[in-house]
């Protein structure tokens, strides 16, 4: 199972994720309590091996902002969390994850407008997009509409429920931020436990 640890701001947190087998590291450039600058992400990225993908999280960025981060960090993947046009997701300079909030168990009607992107399902936004720590209603999702090898599950995951999410959705990857935090800060032990648990699913 591919595991993405998102919202990292400190070298010690990056090390905890990398050392315990994370496959993707997420840097949040959108307005958030986990926001970092391109310069900060560049410094943190120096300690990330090439086999671990670097992901930048954005909400309605300009094309200039995307290109600056892709080149400046550098990023392997951009994660779009807003109402970005489909053409912004069809790019050759980075792979794309398009995030969709799942409200009332309903998949967004425009989910098929992004055929080249990985599709991330998340809980509805609160103050900021993503990282709310809440799950969406797993029971109401029509899984027949989802392409498993392009699907990423997020929203309220933790070491206690990630195995159930994986068995239910059979996704390409799982994505976590607040679920590996204690008092708003990344917790190395929770990072270790989550990755071990997620990768332990047969």
Swiss-Prot record:
Catalyzed reactions per annotation: N-(5-phospho-beta-D-ribosyl)anthranilate = 1-(2-carboxyphenylamino)-1-deoxy-D-ribulose 5-phosphate
Enzyme class: isomerase
UniProt xrefs under InterPro entries: Aldolase_TIM, PRAI_dom, RibuloseP-bd_barrel, TrpF_fam
Top-rank taxon, per record: Bacteria
GO biological process: L-tryptophan biosynthetic process
Organism in which the protein naturally occurs: Listeria monocytogenes serotype 4b (strain F2365)
Enzyme Commission (EC) number: 5.3.1.24
Protein's name according to its UniProt entry: N-(5'-phosphoribosyl)anthranilate isomerase
Coiled coil, from the record: none
GO MF annotation terms: phosphoribosylanthranilate isomerase activity
Keywords: Amino-acid biosynthesis, Aromatic amino acid biosynthesis, Isomerase, Tryptophan biosynthesis
Recorded metabolic or biological pathway in which this protein acts: Amino-acid biosynthesis; L-tryptophan biosynthesis; L-tryptophan from chorismate: step 3/5
Sequence similarity: Belongs to the TrpF family.
